[in-house]
């Protein structure tokens, strides 16, 4: 594939500007929209060009992962945090999938699973394994996959699994930079089959790359990834822990804060853009997102407390490095050219959390042991 053949990045907003002239170009694809990967050979100069078509895809059925509203329960004053029974918060949920009586054992198992060597990528695989791939290229790829996931209405769990498959595969196999996009769409195909009710077809993933790769290319790479990962696809992700951590984080608010959960999701998706976060396990990334989200919402209060420490198993000091990286991502001091996640969370359906202000500095007192 020559440099001229490598397609340039197209965003949803740019595609809309060309929609009126593009409808008649390809009759068979009139309802599709390509989201084209940025230039990997020169990641510092990503041009924005309009795409051929604007897609109006029929919405696919979604699983309702959101629990029904919790019933009103009389409790002690908010300032008093009861640590006597760790099952209290879990037992309040009306969602039977939370498995209140067994949740502590379940999460203990998930913590053991997330640190297994087969489940973890190498923290420095780009330096040790890859010869042609850079951290910036990985960032461009993940940012583009966020757009693809939005285009095909894929869940965040699918996105996290996709990135996990990519990092694990690149920890084992050397890949030419011209094949990096192929690794990305094939990993997303695998994750979609694992997670989604109606996953996109192989043709859809070929089309989203502007037919840079054939069906045979995608299927062959899919097989290569599955063999390299030894078909071990299920693993805990950030979402696995975030569901529980956000419920604990809401406990000391007088009323549930509407922006807390989408803000945690935004910070979590920002975190996967940066190669430096590969070394962190999902539970630590989730806890760091909760820590920073609480700081953004209530900047004058300490974002951590004994209950969060008890449920997450992390002290504030354990989160310092990870929180610092995500904080820099939030302020665009890292990965500022990667805009897909930022644009996604500016929408009203996510409470416009990407526009919330935050202090440029984190107080050093945050990393001391909490006694509240």
UniProtKB/Swiss-Prot annotation:
Keywords (A to Z) from UniProt: Cell cycle, Cell division, Cyclin
Protein name per Swiss-Prot or TrEMBL: Cyclin-A3-2
InterPro entries tied to this protein: Cyclin (IPR039361), Cyclin-like_dom (IPR013763), Cyclin-like_sf (IPR036915), Cyclin_A/B-like (IPR046965), Cyclin_C-dom (IPR004367), Cyclin_N (IPR006671)
Native organism: Arabidopsis thaliana
GO biological process per UniProt: cell division; mitotic cell cycle phase transition
Pfam families assigned to the protein according to its UniProt record, in alphabetical order: Cyclin_C, Cyclin_N
Highest taxon in the source lineage: Eukaryota
Gene this chain is encoded by: CYCA3-2
GO cellular component: cytoplasm; nucleus
Record SMART domains: CYCLIN, Cyclin_C
Molecular function per GO: cyclin-dependent protein serine/threonine kinase regulator activity
Disordered: annotated segments: 53-73
Family assignment from sequence similarity: Belongs to the cyclin family. Cyclin AB subfamily.
